[in-house]
Amino acid sequence: WEIAKAFDYSAPVGKFKKISELKCVDDIAFGMKLNGEWVQQGHSRDMIFSFDRIIAHVSRFVTLNEGDIVFTGTPQGVGEVHVGDKLELFLEEKSVYVFQVN
């Protein structure tokens, strides 16, 4: 999986959001539109492990600092993207990141 997921420019990251700005960290709605069509929608409540548990586990093996990112997986709807495709990412029903595949 590493080759399919970890290549140059494969993990764009937008602006950070403070936890205090979220209604409930255990129920964060998120999703993605591909060329204007919803292809992924999910909630943090559906994760197998809570954020706290994931952070506790990972920090047993590596030092985590403020600003570090821990990728946790993705909801169903994974698929290919192609040059020219437009991706729009949502957090709590707000568009937070839009980009086009070059």
Indicate where each model-derived feature is located.
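Catalytic-core "active-site belt" of small-molecule-metabolizing enzymes
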Residues: 1-61, 65-69, 77-102
